[in-house]
Amino acid sequence: VSDGRAAAGRHEKALFGRGAAWFPAAICYKGAMTATDELRPRDRIFVALDTHDLARAAALARDLADLVGGVKIGKEFFTAHGPDGVRAVAGGVPLFLDLKFHDIPNTVAGALRSAVHLRPAFVNVHAAGGRAMLEAAVQAVAEGAEDADVPRPQLLAVTVLTSLGEDDLGEVGQIGPLADQVERLARLAQACGLDGVVCSPREIARLRAACGPDFVLMVPGIRPAWAVAGDQKRVTSPADALAAGADYLVVGRPVTGAPDAAAAARRIVEELEDRG
């Protein structure tokens, strides 16, 4: 996606590390100053390319490159096309590699060292993997980036999937309010050195208060008022999510399922800009 470089460069402050990949201003090495408040609304949006169709994903990435901040590629696409497919679709476009690693520490560490070679802006793991796994993930991302001579991606933890409600958690033995579990996992991730979490819109304000202003909140479950909620139970509008304290928004079917994906993306951005 050659014109993706222009989209990525639109909101760049600098190149980080010794590699040549482009990264948004807020995506930097641990301890460096973040600047998410300086990003324009469109730069905060990552569009989920949840498809196994390579041509479709590539077309969406190309059409949206100048309209949003990046793309999210998950397990459906990755299982079908692997690393080469990711490179073909997301080359030059800021990438959220959403593979939600959750395994024993050594396995997760090895997977992340390999994932770093794809130069993602964000990668993620399940916070429920526990402290040892999370600490191994932090170390693996740093070492993998150094060894591969590329910038270190931001490492995020998944707290509780947006498709789950309190009844669902009870069925798998997690007792207590869902929001308490989300905060517990977010605090664990922060203590282990991760850069942020993936959380639902309903937990944004609570996690911002609990984890502070420099902890990245990547928020799926984003649905404009004119879009249907689908299978996610904890959703909100883009404007409300940013107002609550989200840093980045993941938008999927409201854009990719629209008759004109580019027009849908423009509509979301315009609504955000109108809200100021």
Question: What are these regions, as identified by a protein language model?
Answer:
Residues 120-130, 224, 234, 238-264:
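Glycine-rich phosphate-binding active-site loops on the catalytic face of alpha/beta enzymes
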Residues 73, 83, 200-246, 250:
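A C-terminal functional module that forms or caps the active site or interfaces directly
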Residues 47, 71, 100, 123, ...:
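Conserved, mostly hydrophobic/aromatic
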